[in-house]
Amino acid sequence: MKIFSGLFTIFLCAYSFIAVGLAHSASALTKVTMTSGSASERDGVLYVAQDLGLFKKHGLDLTFVQVRNGPVAMSALSSGETQFHWGSVSGANLGAIAEGADLVFIAGFINRLSGMFVVNSQIKTPAELKGKSIAVNSLSGGGWIFSMLMLDYWGLVPERDKIQFRTLGDQAVMAQGVLTGSADGAFLGYTFGNMLRGKGFRVLADSEKLPIPYQGSGVIARRSFMISSPAIVDGVLRALLESSTFIRNPENKMQVMKSLAKALRFRRIEEAEEGYHSMVNLYEKKIYPSVEGVRNVIRLLGANNEKIRRLKAEDLVDDSAVRRMEKEGRF
């Protein structure tokens, strides 16, 4: 009995030590929230990082929240309700900054316009978009600015050319809107764009083949948060860099497709293959934000908004955390 009692005591002590250690480990994770207004392969680096536990690896309990539109995300970020936003330069964030929000682009994972402008098969040229309708996620978010940049490149002006924007929802809903005829076209990521092409819809342009400067998907945060919480900022960037490296490795194809299929709610993993192929070379290795890309959108939106016109692109970018990543040898 003494031997049993002694072993039981040792076991109980060991169990208590492990339990306390696990509890301490769990409590040591810092809770942070990141928002995004889209759901496509552009966000795949986030999905993979979550599924692989890379944020936890770097001490973060990160909650990823999809919001319907940019203004809601910017309001939450500005108030401190959230700490990060994954997105591109848009009317929503430029408008918030123009009104005094303390927001900066801290990393650029996609520094170009990435996607396809898909239309019904009756439309053969960009000029035929006159008088037509375009599906967007919101009237100030990424989907809208993507479309505006494409129209600007083609020399089209929505007001003059009677082009209407229809707010439908996320990428899946926008694609469905084009499919059913609720809208004549939409700027879509490659996953949904190729799905429509396979059903006979026309791709007017692949934006990656066009010389349009743009700050695409990246990380936005409050400048004050960057100064007060550099360890959290660095943890997020390390996790995302490791995720993008994982995505580029062809051996990880099935895991990446599983993450994308789950996030986009596909019934079959195979439906994510088109998106996977675009993801492999989608993300920058050097994740410095694009000042020129920000400047291009200020030019476009500033034509009708004096406050945005007065913004300086250089003031909207803080690459200090990215420089720390480079010093660590992350790229």
Predicted features and spans:
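Short polybasic/polar patches that bind polyanions
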Residues: 50-51, 56, 97, 152, ...
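Secondary-structure end/capping motifs
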Residues: 227-309
